[in-house]
């Protein structure tokens, strides 16, 4: 039978959290917020543009217990919420736009919309890539973190229903039971995009994501998709 991981399309492993609701978090991606923590352990990672031309990350996990520490946690936005709404994910962030707040009310999302980083904590001693820390040039918004332990406390204390059965995968993945379940991306539009660091799509499998100038380190991510939509600015967005 087809027993695929809801987030990756791969075969479910022996430790797959069957019947557990997926968990999504909002992570800051401003330059001063880097380096982030915990992103590499996510089963799925979204990067979407928000107001002002900046982007934010939304890592999504099959099992919140796998989160050692993640952050900096940032405020929620409706474009991310709309992605996870059909899956009724636990959505963790710190603060939210008025549009996001209205979406949560309209869809009666209740305790699944967590607005304090799941009792998140401040790491005032963190040092960013420029050597800045809180009280030494780093803004407070870059210091909020949470963990699987914190999330579990929130779920337990608030009696959040984490039971959810998924009958399909997040995307229409190629069936992992095929002999070669890898789509060839080399002829896609994105493969024609190049930078001084090389092609965006490499070997039909990996996409290079570039945020700033090259520092002789290249980051390659597997199972990556690019989705283009027409943005529409909204009034009333909060930081």
Locate the predicted segments by residue:
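A surface/extracellular/periplasmic glyco- and lipid-processing/surface-interacting theme
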Residues: 2-46, 51-230, 234, 239
